[in-house]
Amino acid sequence: MALQFTLNQDAPASAHVDCIVVGAFADKTLSPAAQALDSASQGRLTALVARGDVATKTGTTSLVHDLPGVQAPRVLVVGLGDAAKFGVAPYLKAIGDAARALKTGPIGTALLTLTELPVKARDAAWNIRQAVIVSDHAAYRYTATLGKKKVDDTGLTTLAIAGDDARALAVGIATAEGVEFARELGNLPPNYCTPAYLAETAAAFAGKFPGAEAEILDEQQMEALGMGSLLSVARGSANRPRLIVLKWNGGGEARPYVLVGKGITFDTGGVNLKTQGGIEEMKYDMCGGANVIGTFVATVKAELPINLVVVVPAVENAIDGNAYRPSDVITSMSGKTIEVGNTDAEGRLILCDALTYAERFNPEALVDVATLTGACMVALGHQTAGLMSKHDDLANELLAAGEHVFDRAWRLPLWDEYQGLLDSTFADVYNIGGRWGGAITAGCFLSRFTENQRWAHLDIAGVASDEGKRGMATGRPVGLLTQWLLDRAEGGN
């Protein structure tokens, strides 16, 4: 965790912390905690806002020192923008802005009072949960491979949250831990995060908690199961594949929810070598796997009363003389044959065997998560994941969960009219569908291996990581998936 969290019900003026975080709207209206500090300081805060020394525009933060009558030596005022437009997005932005500002200063402890602000269609528990998740995300720093480079460990370490809902705090912390676990795996370089490392890390976590267990299948075990599609992708790499299976037994005899995550630890494209820019970001091609593992972490930490199974096919798509080729015909675990049209459409080839394997758990619902297609990014950008399902109830559950926590998805069609694009003369199915509708035809391919399941597909290519040299894994959609499971544990939305 980037931060430690506690609950605090002290009066703002008497709180023993290094800094108190309050808010101010564009019309200069102060948040309730800010009003309390203003009263304690005999109008000092109002005067600073009135003369422009404290900004109130969205995205601004102003640090005020030594307010009279206030125990804390600093007050951070966060601009909240237009009060009439204040809602989920401005609230989450304000929390993130505050955490980033606190992390850069000489402030070890702080009290966040923004949780007192009413957010339309949300309750106090939501405010607390999301404050924890967003502030920890904003405070995260990657340090695993910095070596001798100086790591700045100054700044905020403990954030007290105004409120009294201990369960909301616990669920928020659990979700934040899951997000950070996923981000850390996603950010590791591919010479560190190999299939074996990913499997060992996941198994090590599961081994620490009663009710959690892990099973790691090696190449020989997968071959015995007939996973010819997955193993074909693995043929060109010196880093041998693993199938990671994690189980959380919190729901008695109930059928489990099953998450399957694409775990391509590095994607060269194979024989269809990636020639355009962006190959250096292909370490993020395992973020589907990292994020379902992160969701498992959140579920275990929150002790949700459900059964959960996570399956991650962990494979490196590399090139050598034994690598699979375009025009190869391979046999999947389901028995269906696949003609390889492009070796860079490998994610669906490992997922189809993992989805077939997942059937043995008799899922209540089956959801796969994958950085599957650039086409999804072209269609939807970086703001939302793509969602495909033939099951309206499941799709609506996932969409609602994403909206609730602002980790959103957008539904794309999965109509039968697209299926013909996957026809093959030489096999049961072709692994690519041509130039148009690539995200949808990828979903159609997976649907052929989930025909008897209540299944949905999340294409997270656009949301799993930030672009560019300084980009990092985001941990999305751990928030969406954890909220979906929390909703199921509570008996519905």
From Swiss-Prot:
Of the GO CC terms on this record, one is: cytoplasm
EC assignment: the record states 3.4.11.1, 3.4.11.10
Q: CDD domains from the entry? A: Peptidase_M17
**Which of this chain's residues are annotated to bind Mn(2+) 1?**
267, 344, 346
The organism's taxonomy opens as:
Bacteria, Pseudomonadati, Pseudomonadota, Gammaproteobacteria, Lysobacterales
Keyword set for this entry?
Answer: Aminopeptidase, Cytoplasm, Hydrolase, Manganese, Metal-binding, Protease
Q: Quick one: which residues bind Mn(2+) 2?
A: 262, 267, 285, 346
Annotated protein name in UniProt: Probable cytosol aminopeptidase
The record describes how the cofactor is bound as: Binds 2 manganese ions per subunit.
Its UniProt entry gives the catalysed reaction(s) as: Release of an N-terminal amino acid, Xaa-|-Yaa-, in which Xaa is preferably Leu, but may be other amino acids including Pro although not Arg or Lys, and Yaa may be Pro. Amino acid amides and methyl esters are also readily hydrolyzed, but rates on arylamides are exceedingly low; Release of an N-terminal amino acid, preferentially leucine, but not glutamic or aspartic acids
> Per the entry, which co-factors are needed?
Mn(2+)
Q: According to its UniProt record, where is this protein located?
A: Cytoplasm
Domain of life from the UniProt record = Bacteria
The Gene Ontology terms for molecular function here are:
aminopeptidase activity; manganese ion binding; metalloaminopeptidase activity
Q: What is the protein's known function?
A: Presumably involved in the processing and regular turnover of intracellular proteins. Catalyzes the removal of unsubstituted N-terminal amino acids from various peptides.
Give the main location.
cytoplasm
Give GO BP annotations, semicolon-separated: proteolysis
Matches recorded under Gene3D superfamilies: Leucine Aminopeptidase, subunit E, domain 1 (3.40.220.10), Zn peptidases (3.40.630.10)
Concerning its family, UniProt says: Belongs to the peptidase M17 family.
Q: Catalytic positions? A: 274, 348
Task: Show the coiled coil region(s).
Answer: none
Going by the record, the broad EC class of this enzyme is hydrolase
